[in-house]
UniProtKB/Swiss-Prot annotation:
SUPFAM superfamilies: Ribosomal protein S5 domain 2-like. This is Small ribosomal subunit protein uS9. NCBIfam families: PRK00132.1 (NF001099). It comes from the Bacteria. It comes from Shewanella loihica (strain ATCC BAA-1088 / PV-4). GO terms for molecular function: RNA binding; structural constituent of ribosome. The keyword Ribonucleoprotein applies. It holds the Pfam family Ribosomal_S9. The lineage of its organism: Bacteria, Pseudomonadati, Pseudomonadota, Gammaproteobacteria, Alteromonadales.
Length: 130
């Protein structure tokens, strides 16, 4: 792998994102589509840009992403995690500020499985006293 390209893997819920960052003009491409076209929701686009805005590299890096699995929120979170890891590979001095913002830690929350005898993961059937 060339020294000009930086890689980070991000995960969130059931989504996995492979992020490649290189010096450029600030283009973000997700699954061969521009960020604004891929994510319809403004909140998802904002989540993806958070680590770049924090370290003020929005216009300095081109980001190329391949993301699989999950929904909009999970994919946006996975991309954010991947971008954070790629930034740390680029410059280890960015780690403390990214850690303070909470971008380095992988969000371990996943959907809890449904249990036998219950309606959902924790919702019990209605109880009738008589």
């Amino acid at each position: 792998m060339s020294a000009t390209q930086y890689y980070g893997t991000g995960r969130r819920k059931t989504s996995t994102a492979r992020v490649f960052a290189k010096v450029g003009s600030g283009n973000i491409v997700v699954n061969q589509r521009p960020l604004d076209e891929y994510f319809g929701r403004e909140t998802a686009r904002m989540v993806v840009r958070q680590p770049l805005e924090l370290v003020e590299m929005t216009e300095k890096l081109d980001i190329y992403v391949t993301v699989k699995g999950g929904g909009i929120t999970g994919q946006a979170g996975a991309i954010r995690h991947g971008i954070t890891r790629a930034l740390m590979e680029l410059d280890e001095a960015l780690r403390p500020s990214l850690r303070a913002a909470g971008f380095v830690t992988r969000d371990a929350r996943k959907v809890e499985r449904k249990k036998v005898g219950l309606r959902k993961a924790r919702r019990k059937p209605q109880f009738s006293k008589r």
